[in-house]
Structure formats: C-alpha cells, structure tokens
C-alpha cells in the first residue's frame, strides 16, 4: 500500500537534514521551524556555487550562468555599500519590468541585509510615489519607463535613482557601477533569520496597496515547504527525474509578485533550475522558446 503524501513529507523531514524541523521561539511564540544551514537569503543565493557551469537565466539573446549572476550581484552589492552607503535594514526599491538586473539587484540587496522593495511596475507615477513614500526607500532601481515616471518627484522626495538599460542617468547607471566593482566578493554581513528581507505590496483591491514585510526565515520556510511537497509528490507518483536534464521554468508573471519572485526565481536556487524570462508575453514566441530551451514548467 502506497503511503499518502503527508506520511511521505514526514519521512523526508525525518531523513533529509535539509528539511529537519525543530521547535523554536520567535518573538516569544513557539513554532515548528526548518533547522538547516540556509538561514537567510544570502545563504540561499550562495548556493550558486553548487551549480558551476549551469545556466541560470536566459533573457532574449542573453545567457547567464549561476556564477555569472552571483558575480554581477556581488559587484552591485559592493556598489550599494560604497556608492550609496546602504546598510543593513535600509530599504531599496526596484521599479522595473522583468530584466536580469531585477533579479541580480534583489540578490544584492537582500544579501547585504538591506530590505528589497519590489514596486508594481504597472503603477502610474502617482501610485509609484505613494509606494515609495509608504516604504521609506531613498534609493530606487529603475528601468527607462519608471525613470520617466519617478524623476519628476525624485528631488522633492530626496531620492537617488539607479538606471538599468538606460542612457538617461549616466552617473548612476547599473552597468557603470558593475564595471567599477567587478570582481569583488559578496560582502559578509551578519543577517539573522528573523531580520526583515523584503516588502511586497498587495493589489490594493479595497484601498491603497499595503506593504507586506517578510523576514528571511519566512521566505526560506516557504521555499523549503514547496520543495518538500514537490519531492513528496514525485515519490508518491514514482517520478524519477533524469539527472542529465536540467530543471527549467519559464517566468511568465511579474517579479514584483510572489509567484514570479518566490515560486520561480528564488525557488530555483534549491535545485539549480534554469529560468527563461520573456520581454513580454507572446504565445507564439513562448511556444518556440519552450521547445528550443526544453522548458519543463511554467505558471501564470
């Protein structure tokens, strides 16, 4: 008789040290928590070293390995600290469509203990102003369109903008900053499990969008739970993955939403999954890429 999925999950947590569960007190309340070496996002993203030579991200004609991405994020992290004096607990916003720089910026921000604030890139200028004032960020990473929307009020709010894929802001240009700090290692910052990691905004369907703050532990726990459940389903259904085929997914939703950021981007670091990102959704183009890149999964 086959075990049900709950029994398999218990077996995995008892047998695999990556999913060991212990009771821990968080703010004087006892919880069941994962107890392993991946205690914060910096440690999650450092798993890139386990996937040497593996492709991590494909965007149009650009291809990045896990090593490439970590090197870019490390350079940008050093720029944040040295050029903009960003320190642990500071809030740094990202206002951009899906680009590789979005992912590498998020890695850099959270790896130095700062708080990443993904802003809805579909917002109007006034909505972006609301979000920026609400979260308290003074440094914003922007693409061309968001630069045009934010720059009219940037001086009034004392904001600094870092431009990606743009020639409008040469002083604080993402590529220029990478060139300055290229080759430097990721700064070593003491990050606690329950330090704040990110603020994601709700849709605002009944009023203004609300910022939802997540700790490093909260995000890591979510990723580990998904990983355990996926593993349990594979065992139940007797699915044996082909080790010669790299897991892969197509990112079809905005990274400012947790579906894109958590279940597609960050979850990939637990398995060395390849991510393919589209400039915009086009069914015909997506089908071609699914075939050529041998995409296994997508959601949206």
Task: Describe the function of each predicted region.
Residues 33-37, 43, 53-87, 91-99, ...:
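Conserved AMP-binding/adenylate-forming core of the ANL superfamily
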Residues 145-193, 208, 220:
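ANL superfamily adenylate-forming
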Residues 1-38, 60:
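Flexible, non-catalytic linker and terminal segments flanking ANL/adenylate-forming cores
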Residues 220-248, 256-297:
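Conserved AMP-binding/adenylation subdomain of ANL enzymes
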Residues 65-67, 197-225:
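Conserved AMP-binding A3 loop
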Residues 97, 142-151, 253, 279-282, ...:
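Adenylate-forming
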Residues 183-201, 208, 238-248:
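Conserved pre-ATP/AMP-binding loop-to-beta segment of ANL
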Residues 90-91, 97-117, 121-125, 133-139, ...:
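A short helix-loop-beta submotif of the ANL/AMP-binding
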